[in-house]
């Protein structure tokens, strides 16, 4: 179990992650839809995840969402590297009603984000554009090369939820343990 506390002038976050857990989550960010997304992420990645975030929601949700991405990314970095005995690459396409989102990722320690989704508006108090901010903060702090691509869909709730679930399944697959692999790179270190 990895734990972190991160305090700034905008947020105070305490979080813990068990990468090889059972999908149990306790999430309290004050942003209902975002809590639901983080719970879905933990459930489908099979992580045990706790996040408690007190943020400046009177401004908006941006700082809380981005900083939760930073914290979760840091927890993942601590849990993943140096990468040994894992598949390293993961991908998944997740369907939610009319929507389908694909996630491809590389546990490479080379951060990158491709976010190719067209979503506007808000789901509750969660501005749709915050999804990209979360994924960017997560990828860059975890050291993931992360591609999230909308294949089809219109409903912003369905699109965002499919993206979080696709990330979850792709991460679960990339972190599948395989002792025959050793270091999953010809470089000898990730």
From Swiss-Prot:
<dbReference type="GO" id="GO:0004424">
    <property type="term" value="F:imidazoleglycerol-phosphate dehydratase activity"/>
</dbReference>
<dbReference type="GO" id="GO:0005737">
    <property type="term" value="C:cytoplasm"/>
</dbReference>
<keyword id="KW-0456">Lyase</keyword>
<dbReference type="InterPro" id="IPR020565">
    <property type="entry name" value="ImidazoleglycerP_deHydtase_CS"/>
</dbReference>
<comment type="pathway">
    <text>Amino-acid biosynthesis; L-histidine biosynthesis; L-histidine from 5-phospho-alpha-D-ribose 1-diphosphate: step 6/9.</text>
</comment>
<protein>
    <recommendedName>
        <fullName>Imidazoleglycerol-phosphate dehydratase</fullName>
        <ecNumber>4.2.1.19</ecNumber>
    </recommendedName>
</protein>
<dbReference type="InterPro" id="IPR038494">
    <property type="entry name" value="IGPD_sf"/>
</dbReference>
<dbReference type="InterPro" id="IPR020568">
    <property type="entry name" value="Ribosomal_Su5_D2-typ_SF"/>
</dbReference>
<keyword id="KW-0963">Cytoplasm</keyword>
<keyword id="KW-0028">Amino-acid biosynthesis</keyword>
<dbReference type="InterPro" id="IPR000807">
    <property type="entry name" value="ImidazoleglycerolP_deHydtase"/>
</dbReference>
<dbReference type="Pfam" id="PF00475">
    <property type="entry name" value="IGPD"/>
</dbReference>
<dbReference type="GO" id="GO:0000105">
    <property type="term" value="P:L-histidine biosynthetic process"/>
</dbReference>
<keyword id="KW-0368">Histidine biosynthesis</keyword>
<comment type="similarity">
    <text>Belongs to the imidazoleglycerol-phosphate dehydratase family.</text>
</comment>
